[in-house]
């Protein structure tokens, strides 16, 4: 957590809020709770005693499709106007059957669905007006150049 933000940025101070997360790559703050996309799950962090550090790491949505391959991360974290969360999984060379996918997690964390597939090593997501999603992907076997895609549900982008 950072404090001391002013026009000069001369007195910034950092404080660790959480440690030990499994390769976190995305973050959202919703209703003063921090949500983190990790390699194995979407975690909601709770500061139970208000001391500025997370005391409880809630498994908000466990990922059932985890690979040990070094590119197999869950990237970014976006939220739509209905409270649903989205992250994107890398896919090329992973040991999973799912070929790199945008995952939609319901607002209560109980339902995970595949939005779209075909991403090698995505390195960013965005959400536009009307809940339109974008994903940038790195080049690779499926794609000869890096690109940004405006997503539609059910489409393969590789």
Q: Which sequence ranges carry the predicted segments?
A:
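Beta-propeller domains with acidic blade repeats across secreted/periplasmic ectodomains
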Residues: 1-158
């Amino acid at each position: 957590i950072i404090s001391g933000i002013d026009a000069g940025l001369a007195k910034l101070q950092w404080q660790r809020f959480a440690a030990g997360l499994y390769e976190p790559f995305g973050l959202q703050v919703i209703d003063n709770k921090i949500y983190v996309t990790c390699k194995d799950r979407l975690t909601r962090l709770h500061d139970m005693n208000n001391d500025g550090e997370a005391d409880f790491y809630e498994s908000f949505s466990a990922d059932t499709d985890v690979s040990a391959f070094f590119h197999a991360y869950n990237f970014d974290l976006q939220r739509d106007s209905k409270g649903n969360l989205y992250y994107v999984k890398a896919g090329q060379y992973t040991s999973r059957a799912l070929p790199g996918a945008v995952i939609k997690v319901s607002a209560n964390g109980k339902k995970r669905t595949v939005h779209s597939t075909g991403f090698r090593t995505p390195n960013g997501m965005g959400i536009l007006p009307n809940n339109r999603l974008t994903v940038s992907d790195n080049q690779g076997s499926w794609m000869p150049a890096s690109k940004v895609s405006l997503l539609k549900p059910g489409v393969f982008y590789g």
